[in-house]
Swiss-Prot record:
Residues 87-141, 185-228 are annotated as: Disordered. It comes from the Eukaryota. Residues 4-50 form the UMA domain. This is Ubiquitin-associated protein 1-like. InterPro entries: UBAP-1-like_UBA2 (IPR049467), UBAP1 (IPR038870), UBAP1_C (IPR042575), UMA (IPR023340). The lineage of its organism: Eukaryota, Metazoa, Chordata, Craniata, Vertebrata. One of its GO terms (biological process) is ubiquitin-dependent protein catabolic process via the multivesicular body sorting pathway. Residues 95-104 have a biased composition (Basic and acidic residues). PROSITE patterns: UMA. One of its GO terms (molecular function) is ubiquitin binding.
Length: 381
């Protein structure tokens, strides 16, 4: 017991500690479930492509689009033409009238053969037009699933005709007609009519082919324009273009484009063609799809589409196509590493370093900017 228990003490108010409760800290707890769901990839592009392929394999869709529009994919025979040349209607005034009458039966025969082959499998989607009586309404067209099925049927028919060697000449004749139309459009004088240039056209074609022997008089009619196509040299005396001394050399670099595309398509296996068909139907060029398939190998459709989508995103940033393909191949198809490599490569190229040296240094140092820059500066000194 203490002696000071009963003694009152006076304490100043400054020493008195208040007993008011302090407010707790405001903590904002994020919605972890929503964050995780938002960061997950939904694979919408892959699911859409697989759904289209499965629906096209099962049969035509009973649903139809209510909005009138154009088809989502071009005809299959246009895929064999090089994407560097635009398509336009072939001029009819350049050709000789007699030669045009001779060529028309062959084209009609080819069209009948294509129509008969298409009718054996299934009617093509182009036959169901809005104005035809088979369509349910005047303002309705088939949906993209039916268009994809028609494209696959056309691709199958094209592969069959390519194996027989019948389809290669059609894009080639179309390209020759387009080049003749471009040659006439370069002339500044509109007074010269294209009909006056057609009769003397076949005259310089015979000395342009020295390897072929002269035809005897009993050999029959001259074959149509598949063998003797109008070239720029045949129009040179009547246009503003300079005459060519020998064979039509400007056509040689461009003549191999449809042949190369046809050869690549016919050289693919059935598994590779099944991968390329839906990809081409989505709008990717045939040539780029074949090159991407050769680089990535036989993978699933989702991996193939992810590679093409990554390349397209890098191309939209302004990089060259060859450099994008090389970067994706160097970093094992990783879009993030390839994008970082392209960004650093562009920065170091603007500084004046050698491009081959930049690629080597970035590949050795794994896209580490500081170390790569130090080595480039040391090599330059």
């Amino acid at each position: 017991m203490n002696a000071l228990d009963g003694v009152p003490f006076k304490l100043p108010k400054g020493f008195v500690i208040g007993t008011e409760p302090l407010p707790g800290p405001e903590l904002s707890v994020p919605a972890c479930g929503e964050v995780l769901l938002g960061s997950m990839h939904d694979f919408s592009l892959e699911r859409t492509a697989l759904f289209w392929v499965e629906a096209a394999g099962q049969g035509p869709s009973p649903y139809q689009c209510g909005d009138p529009g154009t088809a989502s994919a071009p005809p299959a025979w246009l895929l064999l033409v090089s994407p560097e040349h635009g398509l336009a209607p072939a001029p009819t005034t350049i050709r000789d009238p007699e030669a045009g009458h001779q060529e028309r039966p062959e084209e009609e025969g080819e069209d009948e053969a294509e129509a008969s082959s298409g009718s054996e499998e299934e009617p093509a989607p182009s036959s169901l037009q809005p104005g035809s009586p088979a369509s349910p309404g005047p303002g309705r067209r088939l949906c993209s699933l039916d268009v994809l099925r028609g494209v696959r049927l056309e691709l199958a028919g094209a592969r069959r005709r390519l194996s027989e060697g019948k389809l290669v000449s059609r894009p080639r004749a179309l390209l020759h007609g387009l080049r003749g139309h471009r040659a006439l459009s370069l002339c500044p004088s509109p007074a010269q009519s294209p009909r006056s240039a057609s009769p003397p056209g076949p005259a310089p074609q015979h000395p342009a082919a020295p390897a072929s022997p002269p035809r005897p008089s009993t050999a029959g009619a001259i074959p149509p324009l598949r063998s003797h196509k109008p070239t720029v040299a045949s129009l040179s005396p009547y246009t503003c273009l300079p005459p060519l001394g020998g064979a039509p050399q400007p056509l040689n670099p461009h003549k191999s484009h449809p042949d190369t595309a046809a050869d690549l398509l016919s050289a693919l296996s059935q598994e590779e063609q099944d991968l390329i068909g839906p990809v081409v139907a989505l709008g990717y060029p045939l040539r780029r799809a074949i090159i991407a398939l050769q680089k990535t190998g036989r993978q699933s459709l989702s991996q193939f589409l992810s590679y093409l989508s990554a390349c397209d995103r890098l191309l939209r940033q302004g990089y060259e196509e060859g450099l994008v393909d090389e970067a994706m191949e160097m970093f094992q198809f990783s879009e993030s590493q390839a994008g970082e490599f392209l960004r650093l490569w562009e920065q170091f190229s603007d500084m004046g370093f050698q491009q081959d040296r930049i690629k080597e240094v970035l590949l050795v140092h794994g896209n580490r900017r500081e170390q790569a820059l130090e080595e480039l500066v040391a090599c330059a000194q």
